[in-house]
UniProtKB/Swiss-Prot annotation:
<dbReference type="InterPro" id="IPR036061">
    <property type="entry name" value="CheW-like_dom_sf"/>
</dbReference>
<feature type="domain" description="CheW-like">
    <location>
        <begin position="16"/>
        <end position="156"/>
    </location>
</feature>
<keyword id="KW-0145">Chemotaxis</keyword>
<keyword id="KW-0963">Cytoplasm</keyword>
<dbReference type="GO" id="GO:0009454">
    <property type="term" value="P:aerotaxis"/>
</dbReference>
<dbReference type="GO" id="GO:0006935">
    <property type="term" value="P:chemotaxis"/>
</dbReference>
<dbReference type="GO" id="GO:0007165">
    <property type="term" value="P:signal transduction"/>
</dbReference>
<dbReference type="InterPro" id="IPR002545">
    <property type="entry name" value="CheW-lke_dom"/>
</dbReference>
<dbReference type="GO" id="GO:0051286">
    <property type="term" value="C:cell tip"/>
</dbReference>
<dbReference type="GO" id="GO:0005829">
    <property type="term" value="C:cytosol"/>
</dbReference>
<protein>
    <recommendedName>
        <fullName>Chemotaxis protein CheW</fullName>
    </recommendedName>
</protein>
<dbReference type="GO" id="GO:0019904">
    <property type="term" value="F:protein domain specific binding"/>
</dbReference>
<dbReference type="GO" id="GO:0005886">
    <property type="term" value="C:plasma membrane"/>
</dbReference>
<dbReference type="GO" id="GO:1901875">
    <property type="term" value="P:positive regulation of post-translational protein modification"/>
</dbReference>
<comment type="subunit">
    <text>An in vitro complex of CheW/CheA(L)/CheA(S) in a 1:1:1 ratio increases the autophosphorylation of CheA and is required for the binding of CheY, the phosphorylation substrate. This complex accounts for 10% of the total number of molecules.</text>
</comment>
<comment type="function">
    <text>Involved in the transmission of sensory signals from the chemoreceptors to the flagellar motors. It physically bridges CheA to the MCPs (methyl-accepting chemotaxis proteins) to allow regulated phosphotransfer to CheY and CheB.</text>
</comment>
<dbReference type="GO" id="GO:0051649">
    <property type="term" value="P:establishment of localization in cell"/>
</dbReference>
Length: 167
């Protein structure tokens, strides 16, 4: 019966929006969990000539050519290391499937509207136009990224051309 009580308790708690939490350096970021298709370990990719450094290349994911973006390079991180913790979050953004390279994935958090604060007017590593806000969990701050807006910016149009070159 305790299992049933736990299910009921969880179902009756106020629901919020769920975010996949990932790390880039010392910062924690969150993206809408509904955009996440899967999480994979980092594998070598096929590099595409004449693309910015943050576009690592493309990979074949079960017959689908998926462009891979290293958010660490995109967000101007200095020390980018590929190790056992480095993962690729594969996102399904409607018309586009994209993989983003991050330092690691920690958990999935549910945030209520009260826990989400407006994005500040300044951001050092990321333009505020790509932020949906800041998630406050006690003393923990989570930078909430509008991943669709980030990956639909003009420079990301290069992803489509890179993927079509390989296809």
């Amino acid at each position: 019966m305790t299992g049933m009580t736990n299910v009921t308790k969880l179902a009756s708690e106020p629901s919020g929006q769920e975010f996949l939490v990932f790390t880039l350096g010392d910062e924690e970021y969150g993206i809408d969990i509904l955009k996440v298709q899967e999480i994979r370990g980092y594998d070598q990719v096929t590099r595409i000539a004449n693309t910015p450094a943050f576009i690592k290349g493309v990979t074949n994911l079960r017959g689908v050519i998926v462009p891979i973006v290293d958010l660490r390079i995109k967000f101007s991180q200095v020390d980018v290391d590929y190790n056992d913790n480095t993962v690729v979050i594969v996102l399904n953004l409607g018309q586009r499937v994209v993989g983003i390279v991050v330092d690691g994935v920690s958990d999935v958090l549910s945030l209520t509207a009260e826990q989400i604060r407006p994005a500040p007017e300044f951001a050092v590593t990321l333009s505020t136009e790509y932020l949906t806000g800041l998630g406050a969990l006690g003393d923990r701050m989570l930078i909430l990224v509008n991943i669709e807006k980030l990956l639909n910016s003009e420079e990301m149009a290069l992803l489509d051309s890179a993927a079509s070159e390989v296809a």
